[in-house]
From Swiss-Prot:
It comes from the Bacteria. It comes from Prochlorococcus marinus (strain MIT 9312). NCBIfam families: PRK13683.1. InterPro entries: UPF0367. This is UPF0367 protein PMT9312_0127. Belongs to the UPF0367 family.
């Protein structure tokens, strides 16, 4: 299972969906990246559907997305910190 995580402007919580195939999540990643590069006047609505939770649908304006990432969701719970944009300050 692959996770696609979005960080939104002015939101402390990321939005994530899961896809079974890497090709699916990579295609969505590229679509979002292209939408983020478009001018503000033509900002698209990005609609996402999750494979893990069938009824989970997300729609967000591309101009509100500040980062997007893909990571593989491991079935092994090793106690490590979650992947992503976390900052570890000691």
């Amino acid at each position: 299972m692959y996770s696609l995580e979005l960080s939104l402007r002015y939101s402390p919580f990321p939005i994530a969906i899961q896809k079974k195939e890497f090709e699916d999540v990579k295609r969505i990643y590229e679509e979002i990246k292209n939408s983020m590069n478009e001018p503000l006047e033509t900002s698209n609505l990005v609609e996402l559907r999750c494979d893990k939770v069938q009824d989970k649908l997300i729609a967000v304006r591309a101009q509100e997305i500040i980062s997007v990432q893909i990571y593989e969701k491991s079935s092994v719970a090793g106690g490590a910190k979650r992947p992503g944009f976390s900052l570890d300050i000691d």
